[in-house]
Every structure is written in structure tokens, then in C-alpha cells.
Amino acid sequence: MTVPVLVVEDDPSVRGLLQTLLSAEGYDVATASDGLAGLGQASSRPPALVLLDLMMPDLGGVRVLEEMRDDPALVDVPVIVVTGQVDAVPAMRELLGDDNVFLKPFAVVELLARVGQVTGGPT
């Protein structure tokens, strides 16, 4: 069985890139274009990992993270933040750890390596 990963990203080009990269690695990738849709998908089918943007319409990534931490079914789901919001990086690294925050543009090899470490690989 392949490992489910949820990509929550409002930029269609970044979302598509992440979906393509992760699918090519063998992950079962679901996507959401905003935080509200991402929370709904995570609640209905908890993933092994969420890749989360911070700046999104409707419900931003920080709020998504707070909601996940308040939900017993999602509290233990690991999150990797992928953001272009430079000023948010220190706080996110404090919360999630240095290795779980990537600034856009990100190094593909490093991000895929971290996803593999967190999930144990695609299968």
C-alpha cells in the first residue's frame, strides 16, 4: 500500500509540481487548493504527512496547523511547511523543527529526502 500524502497549496504551479514529484516517487498524493479544503480532506482520510503552505485564501496554514493539533484524529500527523513567507520561517522552525520548514524556492532533493525520512518511504 502506498503512503498517502496531502499537499495543501494555493499556487497551482507549486501544487502541481509537488504532486508530480511525490507521485513519481511512489506516494499516493491528494491535493487541496486552500486550507479549508485541506482540513476537510485530512479529516476524511488522514494522511501520513501534510505538505502545507502558510499564505492561502480562506484559511491560512497557521490556522490549519492549529486545527490539526486540536483534532484527535490529526494531532499526530506530521507537517512539513513549504512557504514563501520569509518572516514566518523562524516561528515555524521553532514549532515544527528546522528540518520540517522549507522556504520557496525549495531544493527538490532535500524536500523529497525529508518526506522520505518522515514517512519511511512511499510504500
Task: Briefly describe each language-model feature range.
Residues 15, 57, 75:
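The feature encodes the CheY-like receiver
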Residues 16-24:
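Charged docking surfaces used in two-component/phosphorelay signaling
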Residues 80-82:
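Hydrophobic/aromatic residues positioned on beta-strands within the core alpha/beta folds
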Residues 9:
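Conserved acidic carboxylate
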Residues 26-33, 41:
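Short hydrophobic/Thr-rich beta-strand motif most characteristic of the beta2 strand and flanking loop
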Residues 34-37, 53, 59-66:
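Acidic catalytic/metal-coordinating carboxylates
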Residues 45-51:
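Active-site beta3 strand of CheY-like receiver
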Residues 63, 85-103, 109-113:
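Alpha4 helix (beta4-alpha4-beta5 surface) of REC/receiver domains from two-component response regulators
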